[in-house]
């Protein structure tokens, strides 16, 4: 069979490059279009070059030789991408036409909507234009969820301080304030007290002015205010060590939702995720409720052909509360870990759906496997504040080393990999925690509880050597 050609809009996020490009290139010819060259790391660029039959970079971002250099690491691209959505759509259509591609995909949250419009113009399978907008704008997303038959929650669009005051009066506290256009929990804030609410809103609103997003990202209001979803851990789990929310990965094919795998989580730092354990140990009844909620949510968004990453709060009486859903792959190593545990390559599966629709070998339900658990974990400054190695009042610090001591692993849990920020790395503690991952590690074991306990012990006992500054 002749290999089909897929256009990849290459940028940050989603399925990590170290898996995506090799997996995709095994079955498809890849053409990589890079709309934001400054958002590509050196290792990402090397993988793009290695596995693509052609690479197209947006020429408008090259002014000097320095612009051809790629950073070693990047979490969020802070340079400007000032092209309006229509111009981005036209560029995608142009590149797709040059190579007569059979499908278009991206791992980046911010290009979901322009990509959907390009797919529609070219007659290619995609998420769907309105559905992509629903999945990108959290106000539209919540409205779609509330219509879809999942748990309905109070919410209000917020642009101004007056809007926020009105939301406070209507919803009350505790209240969640979310930017409608970002990802990775950036800017998500829990408002607990009426007395400090306006100051919190002003702080977040001011801080988000420093977070650059492409001009092509559009929204009707920059924030959504929502009632807080209260979890009820003991109604779902029989053992300790996890969190009161999960994520579930799935695939949409011709408008039908196909669940793939559920990840358990360890407790968050605020709204910043700390670890994902694949697969979930929840019982069959719990999994069924989660799948039902995810199906209603993603089909309710109107999504047609795409990957989905859906986050669900585990509430009282086993009610599944929809947090949000994205029309893309999960980040971190959640997609590679599904392959490690189940042997299913979701990168290839998505491209199969985009090229062949329901002829792809879609799962008949959640994947099942012999007992083996893989955890994808990060350490943040807050962990070292909690274990007493960083003062609560520190404003920044310079890392000298981070080490995991012997004797912290439980059962047959093993460390598959560990990496930490290089010596000399400066960490600004005024940033949102999600920007400040300072170490990452992967664990593997035959018992999920032992893996979860090992994560906890590492968080409590990891050794940080650093120089820090205190406020004057």
Curated annotation (Swiss-Prot):
Span of domain ATP-grasp: 142-355
Entry binding sites for substrate: 273, 309-311, 328-331
Molecular functions per Gene Ontology: ATP binding; L-amino-acid alpha-ligase activity; metal ion binding
Species for this entry: Bacillus subtilis
EC class of the enzyme, as a word: ligase
Pathway(s) where this gene product acts: Antibiotic biosynthesis; bacilysin biosynthesis
Free-text comment on the cofactor: Binds 2 Mg(2+) ions per monomer.
Chain sites annotated for binding ATP: 138, 178, 184-185, 226-229, 268
Marked site positions, Plays a key role in restricting the N-terminal substrate specificity to small amino acids such as L-Ala: 332
Its job: Part of the bacABCDEFG operon responsible for the biosynthesis of bacilysin, an irreversible inactivator of the glutaminase domain of glucosamine synthetase. Catalyzes the formation of alpha-dipeptides from various L-amino acids in the presence of ATP. In vivo catalyzes the ligation of L-alanine and L-anticapsin (epoxycyclohexanonyl-Ala) to produce the final bacilysin antibiotic (L-Ala-L-4S-cyclohexenonyl-Ala dipeptide).
Cofactor field: Mg(2+)
Catalytic activity: L-anticapsin + L-alanine + ATP = bacilysin + ADP + phosphate + H(+)
Biological process, per Gene Ontology: antibiotic biosynthetic process
Residues reported to bind Mg(2+) 2: 311, 324
Protein keywords: Antibiotic biosynthesis, ATP-binding, Ligase, Magnesium, Metal-binding, Nucleotide-binding
EC number annotated for this UniProt entry: 6.3.2.49
Tagged with keyword Ligase: yes
Name of this protein: Alanine--anticapsin ligase
Chain positions recorded as Mg(2+) 1 binding sites: 109, 182, 324
Assembly notes: Monomer or homodimer.
